[in-house]
Structure formats: C-alpha cells, structure tokens
C-alpha cells in the first residue's frame, strides 16, 4: 500500500512499540511470545500438570482464557457492580484435563484473578504485557474463524451469509487494540458499525450528551479503521461520507452493506498473523529457547519452524477424525480460515478439505460432554513449505482493484488467481445508485465489472522450503485455474455462540 511509510508494522502494533527497525521488532515480538511461554510453564507447575497434560491444547486454551479474564478490566468492574448468583467476580477458572488410570478426567479449577495477574506479570518482567494478551485473543479469534460460521450474525445485520470470507476477527473483544483492528475483516468492521448505527436509531440518547460524544469518537475511529482497509479511492470516499454523516441512519447502513459486498471483489487489506497456543511457546521456552535473543516474527518462517518441532495433543470425541481436527488447528495457527484451499493445501503438503466435509467439531469440550469416551491424539501441525503472510487483499493491476472470490481473503503471499463467480456477486448490485454516493457507487461497480477471475494476484510470489529461512528461492506453485478453493462451500459448521 502507498501509505506504508506512515503505518506501523503489525509487529509494532502487536508490541505497542514506536517505529523500530527489523531487529528491534523481532526482539520485542520475541519478548512477547517468550513471556507467554514462561507464564504457561509457571501455570503447569502450579497445577502439577504432567508433560503430556501440559501439551494438551484444551488445557492451554483454559489457561489462556483465565489470564484474559483476569485482565478484562471492564468485565471485572461490571461483575463487581452487578453481582450475579454463583459467580465470584474475583475468581477465574475453567476445566483442566488430567490423565488418570488410562482415562481423561475433567477437573474444574478456580484461581484468584489477582494471583493469575501476578503470575503473568512475573513471567513478563513485572509488566502488564498487554501485547501478549492481545496475541492470545487473536489466536482465539483465528480458532473461532476456522471453527464456526457466522451466518446468523450476518443475517441479523442485514448482510448476506455468502460474505463470510469478510468476517475475520468477528469474535475479537473490543479491547484488542491496534493489533486486533489490523486483523479484522471488512465485514467485521461493517457489522460493528451497523450495530452501532442501529442502536442510535433505536435509542435517542445514544449520540447525545457526554457519553454520546465518546460514542461519536468511537464511531469515527471505527470508520477510519475500515477506510484504511479499502484500497480504492471510491471506496474510501464512500467511507468519508459514512463517517461525516451528522446523524447516522439507514442510508449509512445501506452504504456500508454496499461497501461490504464490493469488498468481495475489490478486497480490503486485512493483516494475517500466525498466533500459536500458549503451550507451543511454553514448550520452546522449557527446552531452553530464548525468543528475545533469537528474535521472532509472526509473519515469516518462525511460526512454521516452531510448529515443525512441537508436539501438541488434543482430546478427540468418539466419532471425530483426528486428521480433520489437526487441519482445523493448523488453519487456526496460520490464520488461514479464509484462504484459498489450493494455496493452503500446497503449503501444508496435504489436501485441506472444505468445512462441510470435516468430521470434527470445535476444539473446546463443553462441560456436559462425557469424558469416559474421550481419547487424545497428536495434532499434525507440520507443513511442507512456508510462505510469508500478507496484509494486502491480493488485488492485481497496481494493487488497485481486481478479482476476488466469494470466500477468499488471502493469508499467504503466494501467486495464484482468485476465481470468483462474478454473476453471483454482481447480482447483488442491481439498481440503487442514486443518492449522495451515486458517483462513487457507479465507479465501484465499474471497477468490479472490469475485474477478471483469471487475473493473477501476488505475481511472482512463491512458497519456500523450510530450510530456506532467508526466503531466497521462491517456489511458485501452479494451480488449476478453474478450481476455486473456498473453505466454506457446503458448510455445516455450528454457529458461534457467545
């Protein structure tokens, strides 16, 4: 993107740093994941988990959730002020799974939030290490993106369920900061804005008074974040209109839905980061790896290399396919829920199946599920190649505007075409080009009509051997141009429920 000079890299957002050079960024990201690893090791010691139990992804998720809950200031304050039956606002916990007499048993643990905060700070040189917390949030968000569908949420806000590829980061908490904003898809931002506008329509005081002023600032900030994701002048101009509206209402909702649809072809820039479960960083730290000294990047070879050497286990329900469970977690680790399956399959070195064909449910186990029949398996998280993660939408012809596909937001910077069904997308754009945004709408539609599904994106970019850490020899894969690869076709996944 042209404005690259003014932007901080994701790693800087992630670590809250000012402008740094590459070495400093690598060191501060290393410090961040090292802190997560140290926290995890300490928690395993506190709970006296065996090596095997400490490598169980479900245990990792419980501990990640505990530390996120311990630092959730707003929710903690709310819980203090609105005491609910059976919930101690000062405590946090969750299920820990242990191996006893050849069976897995669930044990519910409860800790003081203060104690968890102490352990976390101690692992992070006495600091709050918000960046590490955000990193965990993004890992949970990526896992949700791979596991659940958001059809109901899309329909509720008046959007089309086929726009699911725009929904990256839709389950991220509000407090996820700049790093969180960078990974949110266009659809996610549109949905947040529509919810806000709808509240304003239903509640007369929403935009008024001191609170209303703060609301207005938040609204304009969200508009600017979304504007920054668009890569064409017309889309950005429309966002200015939405932002400057005196009294946002249905006209703005219409404009936003129009923009979301347009992003299926004129894709937005959405960042992708490989955020791994805490236990993976813990294993590396425990084996003596010094992340801060070695340096680390979320968008290069490092996460691939880490997964190459980590053994992580998962609980498996009786009728689940362990290979499918591994695929789900692999996609989550690389933030590849919305990537073209042809590209993901090539990188992973095994065929990745669309979600409708997976025999697996989510990774987390509900409290009412029977543990007696639970088994555990090694997750296969290794890859054949590695590739650089992208923050662009993969638009061709001078990165302005090009082919998209209902259901791809590229993760890897790898040359391919982005096939799409133009008729399907364009059908959504009948008529309505009047009103104050008419010229922009006309311009956007014109750009979409001139997009060709056979255009190549990420020209000349390839994948790399895992031995090629300096990315010197790109291997440019050739894909069957006609066969599109969306993860969501024929989808039967569960809805995400808060």
UniProtKB/Swiss-Prot annotation:
Belongs to the influenza viruses nucleoprotein family. SUPFAM superfamilies: flu NP-like. It comes from Influenza A virus (strain A/Silky Chicken/Hong Kong/SF189/2001 H5N1 genotype A). One of its GO terms (cellular component) is ribonucleoprotein complex. The keyword Cytoplasm does not apply. It is found in: Virion; Host nucleus. Late in virus-infected cells, may be cleaved from a 56-kDa protein to a 53-kDa protein by a cellular caspase. This cleavage might be a marker for the onset of apoptosis in infected cells or have a specific function in virus host interaction. Homomultimerizes to form the nucleocapsid. May bind host exportin-1/XPO1. Binds to viral genomic RNA. Protein-RNA contacts are mediated by a combination of electrostatic interactions between positively charged residues and the phosphate backbone and planar interactions between aromatic side chains and bases. Its main location: virion. It comes from the Viruses. A motif (Bipartite nuclear localization signal) lies at residues 198-216. Keywords: Capsid protein, Helical capsid protein, Host nucleus, Host-virus interaction, Ribonucleoprotein, RNA-binding, Viral nucleoprotein, Viral penetration into host nucleus, Virion, Virus entry into host cell. Residues 1-21 are annotated as: Disordered. A motif (Unconventional nuclear localization signal) lies at residues 1-18. This is Nucleoprotein. GO terms for biological process: symbiont entry into host cell; viral penetration into host nucleus. One of its GO terms (molecular function) is structural molecule activity. Encapsidates the negative strand viral RNA, protecting it from nucleases. The encapsidated genomic RNA is termed the ribonucleoprotein (RNP) and serves as template for transcription and replication. The RNP needs to be localized in the host nucleus to start an infectious cycle, but is too large to diffuse through the nuclear pore complex. NP comprises at least 2 nuclear localization signals that are responsible for the active RNP import into the nucleus through cellular importin alpha/beta pathway. The keyword DNA repair does not apply.
